[in-house]
Amino acid sequence: NGRCCHPACAKYFSCGR
C-alpha cells in the first residue's frame, strides 16, 4: 500500500511497491 512515483510520496513509499 503506497504506490507513488513523485518525491513527496517516494520518501515515505517506494515508487511501484
From Swiss-Prot:
Disulfide bonds join C4-C9, C5-C15. GO terms for cellular component: extracellular region; host cell postsynaptic membrane. Keywords: Acetylcholine receptor inhibiting toxin, Amidation, Disulfide bond, Ion channel impairing toxin, Neurotoxin, Postsynaptic neurotoxin, Secreted, Toxin. Expressed by the venom duct. Residues 1 form a propeptide. Signal peptide: none annotated. The modification Cysteine amide is found at C15. InterPro entries: Conotoxin_a-typ_CS (IPR018072). The keyword Disulfide bond applies. It is found in: Secreted. Its main location: secreted. One of its GO terms (molecular function) is ion channel regulator activity. The keyword Endoplasmic reticulum does not apply. Belongs to the conotoxin A superfamily. The cysteine framework is I (CC-C-C). Alpha3/5 pattern. Alpha-conotoxins act on postsynaptic membranes, they bind to the nicotinic acetylcholine receptors (nAChR) and thus inhibit them. This is Alpha-conotoxin-like Mn1.4. It comes from Conus monachus (Cone snail).
